[in-house]
Amino acid sequence: MNNVLSTNIAGKEMKVEFGKIGMLSNAATFMSYGDTVILTNVNASSEPRVGIDFFPLSVEYEERLYAVGKIPGGFIKREGRPSEKAILNGRAVDRTLRPLFPKGYRNDVQVVCTVVSVEKDNLPEILAINAASMALCLSSIPFTIPVAAVQVGLIDNNFIVNPNATEREESTLHLTVCATKERVMMIEAGGNEIPEDIMIDAIKFGFDECQKIINFQEEAVSKFGKEKDVPTLFTVDEEVEKDIKEFASDMIKEAMYITDKDERNAAIDAVNQKVKEEFGEKYEDKFGDIKEVLYNMQKKVVRHMLLKDKRRPDGRAFDEVRPLGCEIGLLPRTHGTGLFTRGLTQVMTVATLGAVGDIQILDGIDEAQSKRYMHHYNFPGYSVGEVKPLRGPGRREIGHGALAERALEPLIPSEEEFPYTIRLVSEVLSSNGSTSQASVCGSTLALLDAGVPLKRPAAGIAMGLITSEDLSEEQVLTDIQGIEDFFGDMDFKVAGTTEGITSIQVDTKLKGFSFNVVENAIRDARKARMTILDKINECISSPREDVSLYAPKTETIQIDPDKIRSVIGAGGKVINKIIQDTGVKIDIKEDGSVFVSSSDHAGVKEAIKIIEGLTKDVKAGEIYLGKVTKITTFGAFVEILPNKEGLVHISKLDKERVNKVEDVVSVGDEILVKVTEIDSQGRINLSRKDVLLDQENKENKEEK
């Protein structure tokens, strides 16, 4: 049976089909918004997974190139590993859904969102969140709180819900708001220095728009939703809980109140060891219960410390930033380096400048795009004092790299202002909370050190939240450290400049958070950001006047677009010879902009001279210094500009009669010649005789 339901969202039809496809999945839906369609399949294991202390949720965001009528490139001609954008979209779906499952639910759950049709005006990543929530709500899986997502744009101080492709180009804000009926669940934002008040209003606007989609989901569930399963939730053995609390409660409290991180961790390890020695044999098959009890005890102490004692684990005020350190120019051969330290969090960011042609080409379900600014983030095990295998970047590294990239993107100078490709790499050297925002600060330092003329310096800060169990009390924290992140309820990352916000990323462990939290976090984040920017300005207040000695030197010239073929030559013969002879990189745009890059400045000058010669028009009446390239019985061929030759007829070689060309010139000689004619076929006629006569006349006049 095919169940169909539709509604109107922002002037476009949103439709869900349920029951027709994926009959063996717990729930499968086709959800469309305009011509963008997501196939969503959700399934769960029948029994909880034993021996784990987390919820095993897997969210897969699958892009199919047939969705945009493309055939994958390469030899295999099929989709490979997910693109970076697909990974980020999958993370957004996961972060929105995960807190809404029942506490203690340990069944394996898989959500697969497959993009099967894409209309560029309607983003599939926004629809995927709505489709995933819809499928879970319709399934028998114990997911009962609908969540919705919208994108908010800003054009001429007016908010736009789910802007189309043209509006997204014009918009200064790209905000994704995910919300339930009562609370905000997740926020992602990139903006062109958006003032705090406008950002808060935009989030409220997005929340209100989400309600229409939530009502749509509730209507669908009431009409054809499945009966929900009664889950088996993980609960701690009461006897284990009682014994551990009686034995370790005082020791846990004493350990958690130690201010120094290393000493506190050592004290906690000692308590854990004592508990193991005391109850290891009695509860040898209850290790998971013991671990859960110890975690809950520590969490309770931290919450009491913050909410009742009004103090933080390291003794800071709630709105206080940890001690800051900024340094530039650490590495002698790199193009720019920034070392940013905040408490025990430390990130070194290295900037590399490349030629314009070093851009990254992105080709997926979106239209082909290029990136001339990119940021990569590495988080090795040694940053937290652990032994871990070094592999390629995971989803977390990709997500953090993209977040820091987004924070600085609106501040990067245009290609016309700064003709370089820019790559940043942030190496996390030490991690105790908020390494992604430390990467923003390190990136600012590295870019300024590299001589990149940023619009303004940027900085980032992570805000946190601690609430009571009944949510009656809540406390926003500035610059959360590891322990506050681990036991806290929210990670609210904000980056920006003195003028406004450039990026936000918010996720929570709760079933949402209030607008009061949103407002306080955004306003407190600004105060902290100003403190950090002051410190950055003390270190370096403006970009270096020149790029590094080891960075490529890039110069730009403009040529007639019709002359581009003259520079490239047949099969690239001409441009490849220039590159080979001068050692430069050459990039040519369709509008005639030519970018010449090399670490050898002389090579750049020589290449430009050649290109200008290739594109310069030969004019009748002008005199050129040319090189004899070929001799015939009737005259000599002379190259007056690169790839431009003319003929000096034997009668035009000298003032006197010439019987043999070789009597006057040889191959390789440089001679002055005048262009006497360019015929209808473009052939150039030259005269050495006219030059000699002109010189003779000039000398005669001077003698008189």
UniProtKB/Swiss-Prot annotation:
Principal location: cytoplasm
Domain S1 motif: 621-689
Keyword field: Cytoplasm, Magnesium, Metal-binding, Nucleotidyltransferase, RNA-binding, Transferase
Gene Ontology CC terms: cytosol
One Pfam family hit: KH_1
GO-annotated biological processes: mRNA catabolic process; RNA processing
Domain (KH) ranges: 552-611
The reaction(s) this protein catalyses: RNA(n+1) + phosphate = RNA(n) + a ribonucleoside 5'-diphosphate
Cofactor needs: Mg(2+)
Binding positions for Mg(2+) per the UniProt entry: D485, D491
Principal EC category: transferase
EC number annotated for this UniProt entry: 2.7.7.8
Similarity remark: Belongs to the polyribonucleotide nucleotidyltransferase family.
Function statement: Involved in mRNA degradation. Catalyzes the phosphorolysis of single-stranded polyribonucleotides processively in the 3'- to 5'-direction.
NCBIfam families cross-referenced by the UniProt entry: polynuc_phos, PRK11824.1
Name under which the protein is recorded: Polyribonucleotide nucleotidyltransferase
Organism in which the protein naturally occurs: Clostridium botulinum (strain Eklund 17B / Type B)
